[in-house]
């Protein structure tokens, strides 16, 4: 099973029914195949704010999930992520990523490094074998 398929299955098992997204992330297709409805936005911050709003109106009983492209897409989401974190709103942000051989090559944007200060938790998934543990920490921290 590929990493995106594994993440999609975990999200389905956690009760996620929809995904706010900005196009160009392989997670969108994988989640759609699991029956999780993607709702596309025109800007990454808007997608994050929709996930934030969903978690707020559910009184934090549901987690908002967002997917976007890597690099500038992940960077554009930081403001919305910081706001959700400041208000203790549970959202899960799934940016696209660089190939492992390009992971720390400049000028690539490193979402984990940047998001450490504006989120409760930020972590790389570098292979399918660690996906379950990383997702467990994301949902149950």
Predicted region positions:
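N-terminal alpha/beta PP-like core and its mobile active-site loop of ThDP/TPP-dependent enzymes
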Residues: 1-141
